Structures are given as C-alpha cells and as structure tokens.
From Swiss-Prot:
The gene is AFT12-1. Pathway: Mycotoxin biosynthesis. It comes from the Eukaryota. It holds the Pfam family ApbA_C. Keywords: NADP, Oxidoreductase, Virulence. It is an enzyme of class 1 (oxidoreductase). This is Oxidoreductase AFT12-1. InterPro entries: 6-PGluconate_DH-like_C_sf, 6PGD_dom2, KPA_reductase, KPR-Related, KPR_N. The lineage of its organism: Eukaryota, Fungi, Dikarya, Ascomycota, Pezizomycotina. Oxidoreductase; part of the gene clusters that mediate the biosynthesis of the host-selective toxins (HSTs) AF-toxins responsible for Alternaria black spot of strawberry disease by the strawberry pathotype. AF-toxin I and III are valine derivatives of 2,3-dyhydroxy-isovaleric acid and 2-hydroxy-isovaleric acid respectively, while AF II is an isoleucine derivative of 2-hydroxy-valeric acid. These derivatives are bound to a 9,10-epoxy-8-hydroxy-9-methyl-decatrienoic acid (EDA) moiety. One of its GO terms (molecular function) is oxidoreductase activity. The keyword Oxidoreductase applies. Belongs to the ketopantoate reductase family. Gene clusters encoding host-selective toxins (HSTs) are localized on conditionally dispensable chromosomes (CDCs), also called supernumerary chromosomes, where they are present in multiple copies. The CDCs are not essential for saprophytic growth but controls host-selective pathogenicity.
Length: 297
C-alpha cells in the first residue's frame, strides 16, 4: 500500500503535527510505504526525520520512506491513499486541489484529515469518481520547531476517527476504509462521520474560541468561573443548533466534552497556538459554518 503521507503507498499533504503523527502511525507497522510532502520543515525532516515526543507512544524518531518538497517530484507515483492534513483555511483550498490532482489516479482514495464540517466536500466535487474519506483528530499536538512534534494529551480513546464520505461504490469505500484503519489501533472506523464531525465542531467552537478569547489553556479557562460559564454557553448553543438541523447528537454530549477536558492535561488549542504565533486562524472552518447554518434556520 502506498500513501501520499499515508501507508500502502500513501502521500501526506503538508506535514503538520497532526499529519506527521498520522503518517507515522500508518507506516510504523511496516505494511505501507509513506511519502510526506513538507514545506518549511523540509530540510529538518529530510535530514533527521520527525522527532516525536508523545504522551501516548513515548519518544520516537520517525523517518518517512520518502520526503518531498514539491508534489511534482512524486507525480508519477501510484498512490493508494492521499491524505490532506493541512490547515482548513479557504486561501489554501484551490492550491490543495490543484496539487492533489497531480497524484490522484482512478483507484486513489483521498482522506481529508481536517477541522470543520464536511471539509472533504471540495474533494468529492473535484474527484467524483474517487473514494473520499473524512477523518477527525482528537489529539493535542504541535510542531514546536521544524520536524519536532510534541503531543501532550488526547480526549478520546482513539486518536483518529475516520468514516466514508463519498464513493462510486459503497462496497469499495467500505473495504478501503477497513484497510486503512487496520494499519494501527489509533484509527477507528465510524459509521456516521457527520455526527462525529458535529461533536468535534462543538469541541472546537467551544474550546478554541474560549482559549483564544481568554489567551489561556483549557485548564485555566475551566478553573475560572467566567470561563466555565462561557464554555458551557458555547457548547450548549452549538449542540442545540445541531439538533435543530436534524443531527442525532447523543444526549449528554456537552457534559461529556467538558468532563473530557477537565480530566485531561491542559490543552493549548490549535487556535490559541496560531494566535500566539501570529498565524492565520481557522475561522471559516471552526466558526463560518455555524453562521451559514444560522442563516439557513
């Protein structure tokens, strides 16, 4: 199996912290060959690999089978899976599609491993003849220096939840999903990815917003009376919106999300990381969809 930053032959697009961990877990069992596409961290990863310090798996040095700086370097490779783990920012969408188009073949499966509701939809539109999977990550991780990945906590039993989004053949998509998640116990196949995406959306809207607004990690937010009040208000509003849109979100989801963070080590959310580093925020992915749904209602 070959993966563009995944396992079989897999290609992973833009090696973020999430993408680096996903690539590592997909390759480590030895059943796949992984190519990673790196940008600013290319020299470090090409020379020394990824240096990972994780609360789940300990410390490791992970060297992908191949490290590329430009997708044109691997455009003649037949990839079984292509994984996009880039930030879900609208300014990069067109570039992402145009790059991935160079390595997608009729049998290639595309996995969108990004934040937001249905971020994979642009792939289903661009590649209607291919199987498209949607993935959700429940890890707190960051790239603290080029190629150096720190994973501090997780709020779910599995790191990655993956489900089917679209495919010309349901049977084929189911087989490709099973094949992918079989590579590592960190991956879990889920039946209804939409519900899981909405639960992650509640989590992101609540804690990314609160931590960025208060410039504090999750524990400091939850230890504050005003912080816990804000968190619960955001979570309940997002939960109620999901129900109004017909999402079968389980009862107790809001309490469960808050309890998960109360029992986890402090989390510096991705939005807070980006804010402190002066990087663009994933506002469209995390908050823009809610505005759209509110207009619909």
């Amino acid at each position: 199996m070959v993966v563009h930053s995944l396992g079989s032959t897999n290609l992973q697009e833009n090696q973020s912290a999430v993408g680096a961990i996903a690539a590592w877990r997909l390759q480590h069992a030895g059943y796949s060959r992984v190519t990673t596409l790196c940008r600013s961290n290319y020299d470090a990863v090409k020379t020394s690999g990824f240096r990972l310090s994780t609360s789940l798996w300990g410390k490791h040095i992970y060297k992908p089978d191949r490290v590329a700086n430009d997708i044109r370097e691997v455009k003649h490779t037949e990839f079984d899976y292509v994984v996009d783990a880039t930030k879900n920012i609208s300014a990069t969408w067109t570039l992402s599609i145009s790059e991935i188009r160079q390595v997608v073949r009729p049998r290639t499966t595309i996995l969108s491993l990004q934040n937001g509701m249905q971020p994979e939809r642009r792939f289903t539109k661009a590649f209607p003849a291919n199987t498209v999977l949607a993935g959700i990550c429940f890890l707190s991780c960051s790239q603290i220096s080029p190629g150096c990945i720190l994973q501090t906590s997780h709020i779910r039993p599995h790191a990655f939840y993956i489900g089917m989004s679209s495919s010309p053949s349901f049977r084929d998509a189911k087989q490709k999903l099973r094949r992918l998640v079989s590579l590592d116990s960190s991956f879990l196949a889920v039946r209804d990815i939409r519900i899981q995406q909405w639960i992650k959306l509640i989590t992101n809207v609540t804690f990314n917003s609160a931590t960025a607004l208060m410039n504090a990690h999750t524990r400091d937010v939850l230890d504050s009376a005003s912080g816990i009040e804000l968190v619960r208000a955001l979570a309940e509003e997002c939960y109620e919106l999901g129900l109004a849109l017909g999402m079968a979100i389980p009862q107790g989801t809001v309490d469960s999300i808050i309890e998960d963070f109360l029992s986890a080590p402090p989390v510096v959310t991705s939005m807070l990381q980006d804010l402190r580093a002066g990087r663009p925020l994933e506002l469209d992915a995390l908050l823009g969809k809610l505005k759209t749904y509110l207009v619909i209602l």
